[in-house]
UniProtKB/Swiss-Prot annotation:
HAMAP family membership: DnaK
Single Gene Ontology MF annotation: ATP binding
The species this protein was found in: Agrobacterium fabrum (strain C58 / ATCC 33970)
Protein name: Chaperone protein DnaK
Gene assigned in the entry: dnaK
Pfam families, A to Z: HSP70
Region Disordered, residue ranges: 605-633
Length: 633
């Protein structure tokens, strides 16, 4: 039975894990690392790089290296948070055909789902090379506070990557699964998850295989990226004060600042001071300029204090919704790379009145939880019951633009709820059902998930028709809504697709693009491997011809030299053809056989001479036989 993998699709890094017997195994990627940077780059020659190779060339190719794209997934281009991001990233954020925020690289527009799919493909390949078999099914994690549009876009990314996404699971819930799988006694825990781009807090009751989420809260635009950007702004500001040059206008300098900020942030978690040193960051008429600056932990903490404090209100709201006090929380589990920051740990300690639990790896625990959920769905992990909740209230717009809730936030899912509404005007023949998600009282202040019409209502006075609206949320947190006229039995239903979102046709096209890209990547890799093998053979054959060329006939030697020349031409072609290189490699190997034979014979002869010389040097030794009785004396 094919394995189901668990993938933590992170803003900054991604991770893949699988159930190995009763244990979870985090799988190392081709570069030997357990996490993969969530980065995709496009080079000038059309090559696509994912993960560490993309990160390595980011400084020299900033406008075509895409990172933190998860922050844009399922968001409209006009979203204020997108506006903020546009000013701080070196690549271009553009308006997609559907009104969503997309990204641009090498003059081509990509949806965030497409870029996420490329990262998922990399995780899929990582798992396949470890398992030695094809992987087609996965459980993918999302921030608990993701809305329906963001969840749907993540599911679309999985589909584009060629994965059947069996379940979308909330990151803090996954972390709780990994933390509490072997814990029998009942506990109330809080999972504080501050990652690269999002913040979640979930309160759960766990024990004896049951994981019940009591409440969840968070901020989908708060994470390590914001801490980095705050530091980038500070560094650019200091440099401008000192040199009068604004580095934010220089994409290359901006990318170098971003890398330096991330490095400094990490260093300051374990040391009190770090030095940021960026030589030749820019130049003006007077010559090159260098950025050198000492940064203390205290200064960094003062720069980001408001960001850390932004995690407090969601924590308090989650405790209130769960009906527990901070003192009733038995353990606070820290998840996400940013939870390593001492200031964050200090705030958590003050808030919950106890030292947070640091016994899980914050970068890997979410993927491990996803793998456990995959094991549950596959039947490999028994006696585990996971009860998650919907993070935001769901409802429809009613008369006067009021948001009428049908399902309150923190309702256990899957769930289904119906309510009967009527018309607002006489002889109304159709009603528009506008579905929103959020906590504000007016519909326009919440996230519009989608709308549809129920038509063909018989003419009646206002308030007479009985229209039953039903909300159905599945275990992935994805919504389906139906409206039924009780009088006529007419029914209309939709799976909510964000007002932007990707249509099935869009997804199909992207799936085909992804498959074509995977094929092109495979071809490119085969070309590189064939080229490496050919170059190695050329080098060794040329060396052999130089040393032993006189041992073969002139005709054989010329045939070898011609084959080398032909293979060199194939290797040096602008677009190396793997098949052509392999064929010419084979030819060179065949014509070199006589040379190989000659080398072998020459070496045999040398070995024979050496052993003959050795015999001449043998000296006969005198020896005396000792009798047994002498030996024992």
């Amino acid at each position: 039975m094919a394995k189901v993998i668990g993938i933590d699709l992170g803003t900054t890094n991604s991770c893949v894990a699988v159930m190995d017997g009763k244990d979870t195994k985090v799988i190392e990627n081709a570069e030997g690392a357990r996490t993969t940077p969530s980065m995709v780059a496009f080079s000038d020659d059309g090559e696509r790089l994912v993960g560490q190779p993309a990160k390595r060339q980011a400084v020299t190719n900033p406008t075509n290296t895409l990172f933190a794209v998860k922050r844009l997934i399922g968001r409209r281009y006009e979203d204020p948070t997108v506006e903020k991001d546009k000013a701080l990233v070196p690549f271009e954020i553009v308006k997609g055909d559907n009104g969503d925020a997309w990204v641009k690289a090498q003059d081509k527009n990509y949806s965030p789902s497409q870029i996420s799919a490329m990262i998922l493909q990399k995780m899929k390949e990582t798992a396949e090379s470890y398992l030695g078999e094809k992987v087609e099914k996965a459980v993918i994690t999302v921030p608990a506070y993701f809305n329906d549009a963001q969840r749907q876009a993540t599911k679309d990314a999985g589909r584009i990557a060629g994965l059947d996404v069996l379940r979308i699971i909330n990151e803090p819930t996954a972390a709780a699964l990994a933390y509490g799988l072997d814990k029998k006694e009942g506990k109330t825990i809080a999972v504080y998850d501050l990652g690269g781009g999002t913040f979640d807090i979930s309160v759960l009751e766990i024990g004896d295989g049951v994981f019940e989420v009591k409440s969840t809260n968070g901020d989908t635009f708060l994470g390590g990226e914001d801490f980095d950007m705050r530091l980038v702004e500070y560094l650019a500001g200091e440099f401008k004060k000192d040199q009068g040059i604004d580095l934010k206008n220089d994409k290359l300098a901006l990318q170098r600042l971003k890398e330096a900020a991330e490095k400094a942030k990490i260093e300051l978690s374990s040391s009190q001071q770090t030095e940021i040193n960026l030589p030749f960051i820019t130049a003006d008429a007077s010559g090159p300029k260098h950025l050198t600056l000492k940064l203390t932990r205290a200064k960094f903490e003062s720069l980001v204090d408001d960001l850390v404090q932004r995690t407090v209100a969601p924590c308090k709201a989650a405790l209130k919704d769960a009906g527990v006090t901070a003192a009733e929380i038995d353990e606070v589990v820290l998840v996400g790379g940013m939870s390593r920051m001492p200031k964050v740990q200090e705030v958590v300690k003050q808030l919950f009145g106890k030292e947070p639990h640091k016994g899980v790896n914050p970068d890997e625990v979410v993927a491990m939880g996803a793998a456990i959920q995959a094991g549950v769905l596959q039947g490999d992990v028994k006696d585990v019951l996971l009860l998650d909740v919907t993070p935001l209230s769901l409802g429809i717009e009613t008369l006067g633009g009021v948001f009428t809730r049908l399902i309150d936030r923190n309702t256990t899912i899957p769930t289904k709820k119906s309510q009967t509404f009527s018309t607002a005007e006489d002889n109304q023949s159709a009603v528009t059902i506008r579905v929103s998600q959020g906590e504000r009282e007016m519909a326009q202040d919440n996230k519009l998930l989608g709308q549809f019409d129920l038509v063909g209502l018989p003419p009646s006075p206002r308030g007479v028709p009985q229209i039953e609206v039903t909300f159905d949320i599945d275990a992935n947190g994805i919504v389906q809504v139906s409206a039924k006229d009780k009088g006529t039995g007419k029914e209309q239903q939709i799976r909510i697709q964000a007002s932007g979102g990707l249509s099935d046709a869009d997804i199909e096209k992207m799936v085909k693009d992804a498959e074509a890209n995977a094929e092109a990547d495979k071809k490119r890799r085969a070309g590189v491997e064939a080229k490496n093998q050919a170059e190695s053979l050329i080098h060794s054959t040329e060396k052999s011809v130089k040393e032993y060329g006189d041992k073969v006939s002139e005709t054989d030697r010329k045939a070898i030299e011609d084959a080398i020349a032909s293979l060199k031409t194939a290797v040096e072609a602008a677009e190396p053809d793997a098949d052509d290189i392999q064929a010419k490699t084979q030819t060179l190997m065949e014509v070199s056989m006589k040379l190989g034979q000659a080398i072998y014979e020459a070496q045999q002869a040398e070995a024979g001479d050496a052993s003959a010389e050795g015999k001449d040097d043998v000296v006969d030794a005198d020896y005396e036989e000792i009798k047994d009785d002498k030996k024992s004396a």
